[in-house]
């Protein structure tokens, strides 16, 4: 593996990576849009020029279509959009200059004759505005706009929304950190009959503060009877269309000798610019294929035995569509997802982070991914000649947020780690621009992915021994973390044995996973399992752990009736309106879970295998996350059952 890594260090071209990021980021790549289609065509043309076999697969984009557990939506085409403050003759938004200045998927509207702008200065509380007439007016709000759609637009008749909301992230960014940027916002329409057809515009915090000041001045002047109206006037237009259309998935292939395949995924979507998120992942994926092909063509590397595939798709949406065709589920041995992999590691930009598999999907793919990161990190010699990393990187426990979640669902069965980057100061904003990209960091991510797919495509016993050695390191780390949790008081005494058994089971099953992809001798697997058992038993003795039995509070066993995780429970509830009260109960319980809620929802589905009781599922998740969640799990399985997504055994 080290020799292959060295070849890749020479073959991967940072300048080429940077150029592709630049080109991809020039397209406004909203899911199911003409701009996304143009970006997909660019990627296809680039692959063609490199002599790499590729195709574009199209799928229907219409609200009556479901792919696995993901409901589709209309295609959106934006020609132009602008918003002007008439009283000051100031252009507030211009989508041709900055496409993020419109709330994506806005419906068409023409109010060039002017309408009143109502500043809702008291936040999202309908009671504060019960005496204010919003009919036919545009509202100006300072917080997340979504909560205003139902009451201000649907009930009180506002026609549109202006917002200067900037998502803050504790410890990473405040509103003032991105004072002149704009938040990436979008409507995610369900296209139900009673859904309002509205539009919206986005301001920077700086422009929003100025507009709020002018609105307040106008109101005070009106109260002093110096103005005829309490409201300023705005005019504007949104020239857009929503209609049944298509989404595209770009698939590229380095053919192998067998029908088995390994996969790289990277989402191609997001607004114009959006360089780290995720033009970086797209660029790295293309460069993986180019660099491997060039090395194989030059005779430096042997041809890949398994087929190597890349898919570039709309995030989640394209993955569900792609996997809905069973041919894409067959014979995929493993995958790696690239999402935000090239940001300059300066202020508020974190390490390149490998996100591990969930423990519900045990596989050696975890250890292979982290080992590939180590090899890619051999970038430059230190003063004693040892190769060390110029790139900050880490490997962390499973969390959600990107397409690896779909692949790693046990019902899909494609073990997939992710390379990402967090923190990212400019995440989902207008300032995720080309200047945040570091070609050398991006090259590190590219080399990691290239080594991963090439090794898995040609896996042999020598590789397995290297990966097993890395598994020993990773197991030792997990055991040390458990000991630290005990010291920190994060694990109760009765929980420690459950935690260690959980770790032992995961690593044991991961050791057995080699049989899935290689005809390995049983003796080598048994030796590895014995090493794992001994290591865990030693930690049990070190911590003076007494075996404890699980206290079963709920012995019900449920089995899923669907493939792939549910993408939106809201969409599922629209199919089963009688489940709304159970959904609301579940949501109330989930609020107590904080930032881990998204990951928790995935894990609950992954452990729902028709064998574990509700209490056992809650115990597994507590071992994974240290979150006590029994009540949440109970509420969740009852909600799924009411929507016929699970059955009690």
PLM region descriptions:
Residues 2, 11-15, 19-135:
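Noncatalytic luminal/extracellular "stalk/propeptide" segments of secretory-pathway proteins
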Residues 14-36, 44-54, 73, 137-143, ...:
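Catalytic-core environment of secreted peptidases
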Residues 76, 99-128, 187-278, 287-307:
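Soluble metallo-hydrolase cores and metallopeptidase-like ectodomains found primarily
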Residues 438-513:
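Charged, amphipathic alpha-helical linkers/stalks
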Residues 570-602:
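Short alpha-helical segments that sit at the start of domains
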Residues 596-649:
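Long, charge-rich, low-complexity alpha-helical segments
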């Amino acid at each position: 593996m080290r020799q292959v890594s060295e070849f890749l260090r020479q073959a991967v071209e940072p300048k080429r990576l940077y150029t592709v990021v630049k080109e991809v980021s020039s397209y406004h790549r909203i899911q199911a849009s003409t701009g996304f289609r143009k970006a997909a065509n660019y990627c296809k043309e680039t692959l063609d020029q490199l002599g790499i076999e590729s195709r574009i697969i199209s799928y229907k984009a219409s609200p009556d279509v479901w792919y696995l557990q993901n409901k589709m939506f209309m295609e959106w085409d934006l020609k132009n959009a602008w918003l002007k403050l008439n009283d000051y003759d100031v252009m507030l938004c211009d989508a041709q200059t900055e496409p993020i200045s419109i709330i994506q998927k806005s419906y068409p509207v023409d109010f060039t004759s002017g309408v009143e702008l109502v500043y809702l200065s008291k936040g999202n509380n309908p009671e504060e505005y019960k005496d204010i007439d919003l009919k036919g007016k545009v509202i100006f709000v300072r917080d997340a706009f979504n909560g205003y759609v139902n009451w201000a637009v649907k009930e009180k008749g506002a026609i549109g929304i202006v917002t200067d909301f900037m998502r803050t992230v504790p410890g990473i960014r405040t509103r003032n950190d991105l004072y002149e940027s704009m938040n990436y916002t979008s409507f995610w329409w369900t296209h139900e009959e009673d859904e309002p057809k509205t539009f919206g515009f986005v301001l920077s915090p700086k422009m929003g503060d100025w507009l709020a000041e002018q609105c307040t001045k106008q109101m005070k002047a009106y109260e002093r009877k110096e103005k005829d109206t309490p409201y300023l006037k705005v005019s504007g237009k949104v020239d857009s269309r929503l209609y049944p259309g298509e989404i595209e998935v770009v698939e590229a292939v380095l053919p192998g000798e067998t029908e088995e395949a390994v996969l790289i995924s990277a989402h191609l979507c997001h607004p114009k610019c959006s360089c780290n998120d995720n033009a970086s992942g797209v660029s790295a994926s293309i460069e993986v294929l180019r660099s491997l092909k060039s090395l194989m063509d030059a005779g430096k590397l042997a041809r890949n035995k398994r087929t190597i595939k890349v898919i570039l798709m709309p995030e989640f949406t394209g993955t569900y569509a792609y996997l809905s065709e069973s041919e894409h589920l067959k014979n995929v041995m493993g995958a790696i997802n690239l999402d935000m992999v090239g940001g300059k590691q300066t202020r508020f930009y974190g390490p390149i982070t490998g996100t591990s598999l969930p423990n519900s999907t045990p596989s050696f793919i975890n250890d292979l991914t982290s080992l590939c990161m180590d090899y890619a990190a051999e970038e430059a010699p230190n003063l004693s000649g040892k190769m060390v990393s110029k790139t900050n990187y880490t490997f962390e426990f499973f969390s959600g947020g990107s397409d690896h979640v779909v692949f790693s669902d046990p019902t899909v069965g494609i073990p997939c780690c992710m390379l990402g980057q967090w923190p990212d100061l400019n995440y989902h904003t207008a300032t995720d621009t080309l200047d945040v990209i570091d070609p050398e960091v991006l090259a590190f991510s590219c080399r990691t992915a290239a080594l991963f797919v090439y090794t898995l495509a040609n896996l042999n016993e020598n590789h397995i021994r290297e990966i097993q050695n890395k598994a020993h390191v990773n197991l030792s780390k997990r055991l040390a973390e458990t000991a630290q949790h005990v010291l920190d008081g994060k694990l109760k005494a009765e929980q420690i044995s459950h935690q260690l058994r959980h770790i032992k089971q995961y690593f044991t099953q991961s050791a057995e996973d080699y049989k899935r992809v290689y005809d390995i001798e049983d003796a080598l697997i048994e030796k590895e399992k014995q090493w794992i058992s001994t290591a865990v038993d030693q930690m049990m003795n070190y911590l003076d752990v007494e075996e404890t039995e699980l206290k079963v509070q709920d012995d019900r066993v449920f089995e899923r009736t669907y493939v792939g995780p549910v993408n939106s429970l809201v969409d599922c509830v629209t199919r089963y309106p009688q489940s709304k009260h159970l959904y609301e109960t579940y949501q109330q319980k989930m609020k107590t879970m904080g930032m881990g809620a998204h990951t928790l929802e995935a894990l609950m589905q992954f452990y729902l295998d028709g064998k574990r009781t509700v209490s056992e599922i809650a115990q597994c998740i507590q071992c994974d996350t240290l979150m006590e969640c029994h009540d949440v799990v109970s509420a969740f399985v009852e909600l799924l059952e009411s929507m016929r997504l699970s059955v009690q055994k």
